[in-house]
Each structure stands twice: as C-alpha cells, then as structure tokens.
C-alpha cells in the first residue's frame, strides 16, 4: 500500500497551517483540486440515500499554501475525506450541526485522519446551485481559509453516463463585495463583477489508489456489455422537459429581479425630482430673504433630511443569470449528444428498398 509520507512535506496539516498563517499570501489562488475516489463514493452514496435533496457535508484534506515570497505561486488542495451533515428541521438550532462537525473532526484527528476543513460539498440536481445561500456559505469558508472550495455533485447529469463533479470558489471580486456587504448597482459596476465572475470553476482530478486501478480492468471484463447500450437511449423527453422547465422558472426569477431594479429606478427618479423641487423653492425663498436683509436658510439641511430609496442587491440577479446560463449550456450539450445518437441510429438502420 502506498505510503502518505511524500505528502507530509508537500502539504500542511492544520497545526502547521496555523504556525505559518502569517506567511500566507493574502489571496491564495487554487488552480487544482485533487479528490480521492473514496470521497467521490461517499458523496454519491449520500446523494443516493437522499434523492432530490440538497445534501451537504464538510470536506477534509490537506492544503499546500502559496508562498508569500512568490506572488505568482498558486495554492493546491487535496481532498482526502468527507462526512455527511445530519439533516435538521427549520426549528432546530444551527449550532447542532456545528457541534456535530467539530466532534467528528476531533474524532478523526484522534485516529490520525486528515481533519482540516478544506471546503464542503453539495448535491444539486440539474446544476441548481447558483443561489445566495450557497454563495454565503462559501464566503464563510473562504473567509477562514482562502483555498476552500465547494464540490457540486449532480446526480441527474451523472445518470446520463458521465460523472458530474465540479469545484467552485468565489472570485476575489465577489469576496471583496461580500466582505463589505455591498452588492448595490454602483459597487457591482465599479468592481466589474458579472454573472460569469461571481464563481470560479477549479479543475478537479480524481485520484484512485494503486489497488483500485489494478481492480478496474478485472471489473471491466466482468461488466455486462448490454448495459453500455443504455447510453444510446433516444428518449430524452424527461431530462429535456425538466431542463426547459427550470430554464423558464429562472427567466421568471430574472424578470422579478429586473422589476425590483426598475421600481427602485422609478422611486429614485421621483425622489431626486422632489429634492430638486425643494431646493428650487428654498433658493427662491432665500432670494426673498436676501432682499429683506434676513439670514438665509441652509440648503444642506434639506439634502441631509431627504430620504433616498435603498438600492436593491444585485447579487440575486447575478446568480439567477449564472443559473440560466448553466441551463442553456446543459440544453446545448445534451442536444448535441442527442443529434449524435440520431445519426448513429440512422446509420445502423437498413436502407429502405425503393
């Protein structure tokens, strides 16, 4: 069995990380995430036991920190273990989950298992994970550890024949806006944040042990070859209709976000017009006071007492737009695969006799 000694020098444990936190680069960028096959199997098992539920759990592993003396160096992340988070009702206290996670990591540490929290995972059907809750949880993880990522597992897309496991992290621009809690239109525009740059996708590499790689050819030889043809199924009505339905719901949500912004714009225009009218009346009143030799009234008082409408947060619209973009990509990719199946099916059919 391969020893983990080489990784002890390359990666740092939590205790070592606390000792070198002062030397860490302020904005460590993760360019590669390595996930053990055991972690993938645990995530899949958790999702299968709770179908159509956004199950979650913490990721444990090791981190290679970026050297502060080398600004161009990137951080590397290795996910070696995970465990599911228990389901709680809305009436339960959130501290129950936190206490459970802390206790689990303490037990793992006692048995010499990697116990450093390097992120979290979530199961999301059809890629429905771009929401404010996911962004807020990821912000809390990256605030405590800049290299943290969220692994998104899609069980529906996986059933189509390809494992759907992606890693995401909040961009530096999004982290800055989250830290100041300012997602108003002006702040978003000045930061240059778009729906494409809220989350950054990080490449994922799945690592299997040497014994598992040796076992794969043996399992492949015993595989029922008839199951391979299930991928050629042309009946894609259920998948496509569900994707289109989610796409329409996303467009409705985006329309609501646009209506909120338009309502704010109208209220802001009315408020500005009201302030301009009050200032104009105050100037006319001051002219009369000057003519009588009386002291003028301050215009700054009107400006200070004037209430302007609060601009709406643009985070919701950015995430909804990113979600719509994901649905469009899924429809495009699946349509391309379906056309390929149709051409293959046509080529295998005997030509009709004239």
Swiss-Prot record:
Organism, scientific name: Monosiga brevicollis
Composition bias type Polar residues, residue spans: 19-28
Disulfide bonds, paired cysteine numbers: none
Keyword terms: Cytoplasm, Initiation factor, Protein biosynthesis
Protein name: Eukaryotic translation initiation factor 3 subunit H
Keyword flag Cytoplasm: yes
Alphabetical list of InterPro entries matching this protein: eIF3h (IPR027524), eIF3h_C (IPR045810), JAMM/MPN+_dom (IPR000555), JAMM_MPN+_peptidase_M67A (IPR050242), MPN (IPR037518)
GO term, biological process aspect, one: formation of cytoplasmic translation initiation complex
MPN domain mapped to chain residues: 33-174
Protein family according to the UniProt entry: Belongs to the eIF-3 subunit H family.
GO molecular function, one term: translation initiation factor activity
Region (Disordered): 1-28
């Amino acid at each position: 069995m391969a020893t983990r000694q080489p990784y002890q020098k390359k990666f740092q444990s939590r205790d070592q990380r606390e000792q070198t936190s002062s030397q860490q680069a302020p904005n460590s960028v993760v360019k590669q995430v390595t996930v053990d096959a055991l972690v993938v199997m645990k995530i899949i098992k958790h999702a299968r036991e709770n179908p159509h539920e956004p199950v979650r759990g913490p990721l444990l592993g090791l981190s290679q920190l970026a050297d502060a003396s080398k600004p161009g160096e990137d951080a590397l992340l290795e996910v070696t273990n995970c465990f599911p988070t228990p389901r709680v009702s809305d009436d339960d206290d959130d501290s129950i989950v936190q206490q459970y996670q802390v206790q689990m990591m303490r037990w793992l540490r006692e048995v010499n298992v990697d116990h450093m929290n390097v992120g979290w995972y979530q199961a999301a059907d059809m890629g429905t994970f771009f929401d404010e809750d996911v962004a807020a949880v990821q912000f809390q993880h990256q605030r405590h550890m800049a290299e943290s990522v969220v692994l998104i597992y899609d069980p529906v897309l996986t059933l189509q024949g390809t494992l759907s496991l992606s890693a995401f992290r909040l961009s530096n621009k999004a982290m800055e806006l989250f830290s100041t809690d300012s997602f108003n239109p002006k702040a978003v525009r000045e930061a240059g944040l778009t729906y494409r740059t809220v989350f950054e996708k990080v490449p994922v590499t799945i690592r299997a042990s040497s014994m598992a790689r040796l076992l794969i050819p043996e399992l492949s030889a015993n595989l029922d070859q008839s199951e391979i043809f299930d991928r050629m199924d042309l009946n894609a009505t259920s998948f496509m209709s569900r994707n289109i339905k989610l796409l329409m719901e996303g467009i409705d949500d985006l329309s609501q976000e646009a209506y909120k912004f338009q309502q704010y714009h109208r209220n802001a225009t009315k408020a500005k017009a009201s302030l301009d009218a009050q200032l104009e009346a105050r100037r006319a009143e001051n002219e009369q006071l000057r003519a009588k030799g009386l002291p003028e009234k301050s215009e700054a008082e009107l400006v200070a007492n004037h209430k302007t409408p609060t601009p709406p947060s643009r985070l919701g619209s950015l995430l909804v737009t990113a979600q719509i973009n994901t649905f469009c990509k899924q429809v495009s990719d699946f349509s391309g695969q379906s056309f390929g199946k149709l051409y293959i099916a046509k080529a295998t059919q005997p030509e009709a006799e004239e």
